[in-house]
Amino acid sequence: MNIFDRKINFDALLKFSHITPSTQQHLKKVYASFALCMFVAAAGAYVHVVTHFIQAGLLSALGSLALMIWLMATPHSHETEQKRLGLLAGFAFLTGVGLGPALELCIAVNPSILPTAFMGTAMIFTCFSLSALYARRRSYLFLGGILMSAMSLMLLSSLGNLFFGSIWLFQANLYLGLLVMCGFVLFDTQLIIEKAEHGDKDYIWHCVDLFLDFVTLFRKLMLILAFNEKDKKKEKK
């Protein structure tokens, strides 16, 4: 039998038998909201980079934080669903605006960095999300403590680097941050599944977790590529 004649069973590939149907429906809502966030964040980034109508700064950062807190404080119910989706869209928009300075930096170095970083982030996020979805339930939840410890270490090193000003430490933080965020995609995806299995169906807030994972991954990868490109240009000179 010719192995090239075999048909791929896509239904089997997309079958998550260890996840209950209600949780699968919940995940569909989470990823639909995530897609909305990506679209709105792209609009926010466009406003900063192209139109300059709204610029990233202290006000946009505070606005983003305020909307996230407001969203978190608003209880999840059918009556508040539309309001919370509006808050989510506003948060995603200002988050996109906040990406503006990093985007401008990369455009100044090499505009091709942006599509490369986005496609790379999308591939990383998709692969790690599928790994978490296909894996045995709770198999990645042990990462929580390790990831939080790594985040604390990164925070301390970033604060220390304010005094040392080491470019090597900054770049090491970028690479470590990229690795940590890959871990958070695994952890957050499985945590969302477990919360949904235990009755927590707040898909809007669960979407925030994954959206922040993606944005942070994108920012880290974008800056890594930008620094590598700058190093290549220096070597050519």
From Swiss-Prot:
InterPro entries: Bax_inhbtr1_CS, Bax_inhibitor_1-related. It comes from the Eukaryota. Residues 207-227 dip into the membrane without crossing it. GO terms for cellular component: endoplasmic reticulum membrane. CDD domains: BI-1 (cd10430). GO terms for biological process: autophagy; cellular response to unfolded protein; endoplasmic reticulum calcium ion homeostasis; intrinsic apoptotic signaling pathway in response to endoplasmic reticulum stress; negative regulation of calcium ion transport into cytosol; negative regulation of endoplasmic reticulum stress-induced intrinsic apoptotic signaling pathway; negative regulation of hypoxia-induced intrinsic apoptotic signaling pathway; negative regulation of immunoglobulin production. Ubiquitinated by BFAR, leading to proteasomal degradation. Highly abundant in adult testis. It is a multi-pass membrane protein. Keywords: Apoptosis, Autophagy, Calcium, Endoplasmic reticulum, Isopeptide bond, Membrane, Transmembrane, Transmembrane helix, Ubl conjugation, Unfolded protein response. Residues 1-29, 74-86, 134-139, 188-206, 228-237 are cytoplasmic. Residues 51-52, 108-112, 161-166 are lumenal. The chain crosses the membrane at residues 30-50, 53-73, 87-107, 113-133, 140-160, 167-187. There is a cross-link at K7 (Glycyl lysine isopeptide (Lys-Gly) (interchain with G-Cter in ubiquitin)). GO terms for molecular function: endoribonuclease inhibitor activity; enzyme binding; ubiquitin protein ligase binding. Its main location: endoplasmic reticulum. It is found in: Endoplasmic reticulum membrane. Disruption phenotype: Tmbim6-deficient mice are viable and develop normally although they exhibit increased vulnerability to tissue damage induced by stimuli that trigger ER stress. Interacts with BCL2. Interacts with BCL2L1. Interacts with ERN1. The intra-membrane loop at the C-terminus acts as a calcium pore, mediating calcium leak from the ER into the cytosol. Belongs to the BI1 family. Endoplasmic reticulum (ER)-resident protein that confers cellular protection as an anti-apoptotic protein by limiting multiple stress-inducing pathways surrounding the endoplasmic reticulum and mitochondria. Inhibits the activities of the key sensor for the endoplasmic reticulum unfolded protein response IRE1alpha/ERN1 both directly and by blocking BAX/BAK binding. Modulates ER calcium homeostasis by acting as a calcium-leak channel. Negatively regulates autophagy and autophagosome formation, especially during periods of nutrient deprivation, and reduces cell survival during starvation. This is Bax inhibitor 1. The lineage of its organism: Eukaryota, Metazoa, Chordata, Craniata, Vertebrata.
